[in-house]
Structures are given as C-alpha cells and as structure tokens.
C-alpha cells in the first residue's frame, strides 16, 4: 500500500551503501540480478560478489532473516556465466548467513514480466515467429506466489533452498502456442537451429560492444542462448511451494489480464467485427 514501502538507492557493489540501507532492518530480501555480462554491474559484481556482500553485512548488523532470490536450474547449467555467478552467489549467501532462505524461481510472470510480454510483442512482427530452444521446458511461476514464499522467509517460518515452479510445464514452443492463442494471432513458428541463435546473439552482442553500450542488445545474448540448453523446471525431491503450503497459480488464470494489449485490436478485439 502507498506509504508502506519506501524506495531508497543502494549500490550493491559498495559495503557502505549496502550497510546504510540494511542497518536497523529485521529482515532483508535480495532480489537483485542482471543479464549484463560487461560494465560495472556485470554478472560477477552483482550476482556473485553482490549477493555475498548483502549476506555478510546483514549478518554483521544482526539482521534476523535473509531471503535471497536466485534462479531455477542454476545448479544444473554448467555453460552460462549467468548460472555460474548465481551459483557463486548462493554459496556466498550460505557461507555468510547459513539460515538464509534461497528461492529458485522459474521464469516469473506478471503484469510487467519479461517472458510472456516479450514473446507476445514479437508475435506482432512479421509473417512468421522465429524461435530458438523450442524444446527447452519451462515452468513459469506467478510473481505473487514468489512473493508469498519470500514473506515466509521474512517472518522466519521457513529457511533453506526452495525450487519454485508453476503448476504447468511446457516446452518453449508449447508456451508460444499459448501466447499466440491469447493474443489472437495465427502464424507459423520457425524453430531455428541453435547455431543460428549463437550467430545472431554474437552479432547483437558485438553491436552493443562496438557502440559502447549505446545500442543495447535487448533481444538475446550469447549467454542466454547457452541457458536455453538447460530445462527450467523443478527437480524431483526439491523443496517446493507444496512444502510452504502455497498453491501455485496457472499462467492462463493471469496472462489474459495484460496480454490483451498485443491483440490486433487490443481490448476491443472481440467486438471488432
């Protein structure tokens, strides 16, 4: 609610800055992550060193409970820098704050998500839908469900590592079909080979490098292509929503409320005829 959350600036790369926003807190939730492989806020600085710093300072200042948001599959993805630094971050957190709660969500969906919104936006462009990693499985999880899990760590009723996935698992191609149906668009989906994805990502990464970051690669990076080789689903035997008493929300129950804007006639698509 308005007035109950006060945003403050913090540099996760600086001890004094982290200490300033942590001091006096009973609980800390670290949601900071990045897809940038270069610059000051790169993978190592944010997801490895930054995560360890937050945990170390929280412990030193007597914070009671710490929740660290990681990502699903990082313990199985041996290829990407994103996963490597997420793993290092988890290790640093547990070394400094052993009672921390670590949440590993699959791709998170909600009003401003970067999964369903991104692909729905792509569906508006061109006569075909190009896709890489179409056979990789995903288990999208609702942002409010992840928040409910985090609250349990904040109040100290749960700790340890939890893998969070929604109630439905589909291949990426399967989720594209769901999105196309939701935005009322029909077009063939072209499953591009991974080497095509690597070439395209290399070109986009080079564009960003040669323009000194002015032209951002917001489509797909080489590291994200590597991530598409690993399924993004909950492992058997992992602690999950069920252990927290939370019933996960299906994407179809939520995405219609915000994907309508990608339909040919937006919210009036049903009556355009």
PLM feature spans:
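NAD(P)H-binding glycine-rich loop region in Rossmannoid oxidoreductase-like domains
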Residues: 1-61, 71-78
